[in-house]
Amino acid sequence: MATQWEVVIGLETHAQLSTVSKIFSGAPTQFGAEPNTQACPVDLALPGVLPVLNRGAVERAIRFGLAIGSTIAPRSIFARKNYFYPDLPKGYQISQYEIPVVQGGQITIQVPANEKAGKPAYEKTVNLTRAHLEEDAGKSLHEDFAGMTGIDLNRAGTPLLEIVTEPEMRSAAEAVAYAKSLHALVVWLGICDGNMQEGSFRCDANVSVRPVGQEKFGTRAEIKNLNSFRFLEEAINYEVRRQIELIEDGGEVVQETRLYDPDKRETRSMRSKEDAHDYRYFPDPDLMPLVIGQDWIERVQAGMPELPAAIQQRFVEQYGVSAYDAGVLTSSKAMAAYFEAVVAKAGAANAKIAANWLMGDVSSQLNRDGIEIDAIPVSAAQLALVLQRIADGTISNKIAKEIFSAIWDEKATDEAAADRIIDAKGLKQISDTGALEAIIDEVLAANAKSVEEFRAGKEKAFNALIGQAMKATKGKANPQQVNELLKKKLG
């Protein structure tokens, strides 16, 4: 990407709130029901019906606001956002415009290292502009009707919290890191189930470019309804390339709304981008202003869980893990709880190795089986014993992986499964110096060429000899002990 251009990204994220009923009616919000079976007269905009605000939706918005350190508006207004679309029965959407319920706030993100670009991992704080309550629209179904479009109003009126950032992100990597952090937070708080496939969490990305050093923002394009982190990254990267190439070829970027085509991995124009005045916002006369007293905020505060940021800091200070690792370990409540349970059994001295295992072998196995950490077949106590056996020298790290896989595959229920498997398969590390010296002597005799190369100054030859020694012991030798004995014998 051309280094003379700076990327500017702001995200608008729609988080579907986990209420049982809709934001202005008593209709259910269950996903996957038959079309138009979860829409009541309010959702259908039939004459003579009035909206009634769902208290649970408001409390979830307050909970989010408290978590990000925002200001909870003591008085906020619902407004009508006027536009025509077939799946919007009223001809307007009830949203918030001038006075949102959540104002300001910030989220600290951990941006992973980019080894190809030579960029290390770093931390960044993203400021939020606002978060406001609104209702979702229905859904247009194009595939099932030849030449026609079906309208499913089950989703109409589902409560959403639209979360808007300042245009402070400068790369797709930062945008994805923010989206992942936000996703983890709303799920952690219990205000959204975070199911991206069902549309419970989706992002709109506002993307522009400008010459490095220029203060004025470039013309932005909005990419709508990105419902996976991969699509978000691909869409932003494509859009940045498109805009830079367009400008460098003498063209101008048009303010518009675009869609991302994941098959072609490109964005395409959908419609011209509207401004606020196009929607003719005005206060909804059917809804009173939302008044939130301090006592209400305090009641919500009393029910708040320990937040990921606080736990991350505790993990760094108490266990000595890196800030990035702490961020991964708090990606979900279940992951954080599992890590703490492992450390409680294995001891704080083994916290770093526990963190490495959770981010490595454990995550790899979870991905392989397509399950979440709360469904892991290896208990925290079982993994802790594996780590203890590495620490006390009973087994090597390589053998530990074999034991972990065995416990996983057999879905063992006994807490001492690691010891049982070690004994049954004879996997104890060979730490007897005499026995190891005999094996190393055989390895040196059989690999005279490598010995000569090492003595000639080739360090790789030494690694080859270690590999041969480990192979001769079937991975059961203590690697450190092998290293020391080889150095001793090779002088």
Swiss-Prot record:
Top-rank EC class of the record's enzyme: ligase
SUPFAM superfamilies: GatB/YqeY motif, Glutamine synthetase/guanido kinase
Keyword ATP-binding applies: yes
Keyword Flavoprotein assigned: no
Gene Ontology biological-process annotations: glutaminyl-tRNAGln biosynthesis via transamidation; translation
Alphabetized GO MF terms: asparaginyl-tRNA synthase (glutamine-hydrolyzing) activity; ATP binding; glutaminyl-tRNA synthase (glutamine-hydrolyzing) activity
Reactions that this protein is recorded to catalyse: L-glutamyl-tRNA(Gln) + L-glutamine + ATP + H2O = L-glutaminyl-tRNA(Gln) + L-glutamate + ADP + phosphate + H(+); L-aspartyl-tRNA(Asn) + L-glutamine + ATP + H2O = L-asparaginyl-tRNA(Asn) + L-glutamate + ADP + phosphate + 2 H(+)
Keyword field: ATP-binding, Ligase, Nucleotide-binding, Protein biosynthesis
EC number, UniProt record: 6.3.5.-
Cross-referenced Pfam families: GatB_N, GatB_Yqey
Signal peptide span: none
Quaternary structure (record): Heterotrimer of A, B and C subunits.
Assigned protein family: Belongs to the GatB/GatE family. GatB subfamily.
Function: Allows the formation of correctly charged Asn-tRNA(Asn) or Gln-tRNA(Gln) through the transamidation of misacylated Asp-tRNA(Asn) or Glu-tRNA(Gln) in organisms which lack either or both of asparaginyl-tRNA or glutaminyl-tRNA synthetases. The reaction takes place in the presence of glutamine and ATP through an activated phospho-Asp-tRNA(Asn) or phospho-Glu-tRNA(Gln).
Name of the featured protein: Aspartyl/glutamyl-tRNA(Asn/Gln) amidotransferase subunit B
Lineage: Bacteria, Pseudomonadati, Pseudomonadota, Betaproteobacteria, Burkholderiales
